[in-house]
Amino acid sequence: MTSRTEAVKAYLLDLQDRICSALETEDGGARFVEDAWVRDAGGGGRTRVIGEGKVIEKGGVNFSHVFGAGLPPSASAHRPELAGRGFEALGVSLVIHPHNPHVPTSHANVRFFIAEKEGEEAVWWFGGGFDLTPYYGNEEDCVHWHRVAEQACAPFGADVYPRYKAWCDRYFHLKHRGEPRGIGGLFFDDLNEWDFDTCFAFMRAIGDAYVDAYLPIIQRRKDTPYTAKQREFQEYRRGRYVEFNLVYDRGTLFGLQSGGRTESILMSLPPQVRWGYDWKAEPGSEEARLTDYFLQDRDWLAQ
């Protein structure tokens, strides 16, 4: 493990600790349970899960550090020149599914890849981002989420937030449904356009911004009363989350194709989900407004 990899690993372990501590404090009931694991083909990680809390119905914050002799297809499909290289991958990935339908689901991920081949220069890159999936949209929350994202990107250039915001909108899109998974945020991958230290600093800025983006939303919405009907709608919309993660998500595909730990990879799935055949929201309802207004390509900072 190189000094660069060691520095990234130290940051990611600390990030996992800080995020878990902040979420435990905010929940005020449940605590994370840690499950350390070892990957037979090389590496391992520590999965931390939380459930049935006062606020969080199910959540997970996973650290992994895996390596192998060859990149799996999900990682080399768009970079065929990397096929056959040994790899090392480190990351923190998290998903939080709250009880209350008025509190959005959140997802964040930061990661580092390095692909090596004897006699050739190592190829490295960073990736990550965070995105928000509301069930009952609130404009204040959407603007706050994107404002924090913009502020995290600002030191790295005025074009960074709009570029990675647009990438997030494209990435978290369910092609078979013709709709986005949520209201977006940031997404970046294959980041090595700056020097290593700048790229690493950017990854840290995104990782550190997650708590600032999400906790104020929890605090504003966690005590909002909700009905059984609203809970059913939340479970229906969670189905879209499952569909995206199992069909499109590159992290899920990479984990499964590289022989990762299935329980840790699938920790992102919500605990209660429903599908209704050809279900449609009543026109003009709160449920219809989610797709008609919130799940649209929108510049939230121009509101």
From Swiss-Prot:
One of its GO terms (cellular component) is cytoplasm. It is found in: Cytoplasm. It catalyses: coproporphyrinogen III + O2 + 2 H(+) = protoporphyrinogen IX + 2 CO2 + 2 H2O. Its EC number is 1.3.3.3. A divalent metal cation binds at residues 97, 107, 146, 176. Keywords: Cytoplasm, Heme biosynthesis, Metal-binding, Oxidoreductase, Porphyrin biosynthesis. It holds the Pfam family Coprogen_oxidas. Gene3D superfamilies: Coproporphyrinogen III oxidase, aerobic. SUPFAM superfamilies: Coproporphyrinogen III oxidase. It is an enzyme of class 1 (oxidoreductase). InterPro entries: Coprogen_oxidase_aer, Coprogen_oxidase_aer_sf, Coprogen_oxidase_CS. Residues 241-276 are annotated as: Important for dimerization. One of its GO terms (biological process) is protoporphyrinogen IX biosynthetic process. The active site is at 107 (proton donor). Substrate binds at residues 93, 109-111, 259-261. Its cofactor is a divalent metal cation. One of its GO terms (molecular function) is protein homodimerization activity. Pathway: Porphyrin-containing compound metabolism; protoporphyrin-IX biosynthesis; protoporphyrinogen-IX from coproporphyrinogen-III (O2 route): step 1/1. It comes from the Bacteria. The record marks 176 as: Important for dimerization. Belongs to the aerobic coproporphyrinogen-III oxidase family. Involved in the heme biosynthesis. Catalyzes the aerobic oxidative decarboxylation of propionate groups of rings A and B of coproporphyrinogen-III to yield the vinyl groups in protoporphyrinogen-IX. Homodimer. This is Oxygen-dependent coproporphyrinogen-III oxidase. It comes from Pseudomonas entomophila (strain L48). The lineage of its organism: Bacteria, Pseudomonadati, Pseudomonadota, Gammaproteobacteria, Pseudomonadales. The gene is hemF.
